[in-house]
UniProtKB/Swiss-Prot annotation:
Record carries keyword Nucleotide-binding: yes
EC number: 3.6.4.-
Name this polypeptide is given: Actin
The organism's taxonomic lineage, starting at the top: Eukaryota, Sar, Alveolata, Apicomplexa, Conoidasida
Subunit structure: Component of a complex, at least composed of ald-1, microneme protein MIC2 and ACT1. Interacts (G-actin) with ADF; the interaction results in inhibition of actin polymerization. Interacts (F-actin) with ald-1.
Record's catalysed reaction(s): ATP + H2O = ADP + phosphate + H(+)
Main localization (coarse): cytoplasm
Pfam family, one: Actin
Amino acid sequence: MADEEVQALVVDNGSGNVKAGVAGDDAPRAVFPSIVGKPKNPGIMVGMEEKDCYVGDEAQSKRGILTLKYPIEHGIVTNWDDMEKIWHHTFYNELRVAPEEHPVLLTEAPLNPKANRERMTQIMFETFNVPAMYVAIQAVLSLYSSGRTTGIVLDSGDGVSHTVPIYEGYALPHAIMRLDLAGRDLTEYMMKILHERGYGFTTSAEKEIVRDIKEKLCYIALDFDEEMKAAEDSSDIEKSYELPDGNIITVGNERFRCPEALFQPSFLGKEAAGVHRTTFDSIMKCDVDIRKDLYGNVVLSGGTTMYEGIGERLTKELTSLAPSTMKIKVVAPPERKYSVWIGGSILSSLSTFQQMWITKEEYDESGPSIVHRKCF
């Protein structure tokens, strides 16, 4: 089955974007929004060939006439019919491959419910007829892609953030922490604070513009209060941004106020602890003997960790929480936006991994529950 010439497919299903491609590549071939759109008023255009559903970029570009849904919320699949459409689109439209000819590696959120892994397994074998598949935890793949097998991953994407301590390649489930604060919340917060400046962004189309402003202009201050003072005294931090209609807006302290919510969730009216505290709490739930290894290998992963200054700030915050003699190292790999996918590409190309696949035969013999025995 696992012949050298058959390439595995790697599909990382995020709340915001699907990253998909072929094992062995160094980056995903396809990255598109995890959206399914259905026409608001079906059949209104006479003689127009109208599909009953659009996926990804096409749904995004026709968003004016569609109702958009995200089938993955906070990292976990909540709508399986739409999820199936996304996978179908991934294989047939984006990668243009026949899934029945390739082993498929899928990713899942940490602490994904058992029933969900079984459902994924079932859909792959029964709907897409894959010859083999495997489900890997996203944060573990990120750690592999950084060349480590022990460390703590702070993975923050569009829908959810997690801190996942990993020892010798295994995630420690009792110490995993989840924070429902991620990219989408920051985009909404950015809309809110730009509103206070007099820029009204409200529609879902305008939300995409704000997301772009956030991604291009935001950064994380080393010291928030100092930065606020500096921003009052000078206009050095102001940057301008050209909107699609040619208007130009100016963005000032919003540039660092927006992502500051990662460290101070109270900005969003959330009671949760910030990412630094969550990381610390996660480490403290681990055995005292491995904490030193975790503090020395804090690995950032996911699109919401792409802000300039995040590594320095996290180092500073962890240093003040940890014992004074502790050596703290925060690693921010440049490719961390796609590190989950890259880790999957590496893992599924290893010769030692080939016996780990769940094969069609094993599935037919044991049913969906095989996933709990073979993927952990």
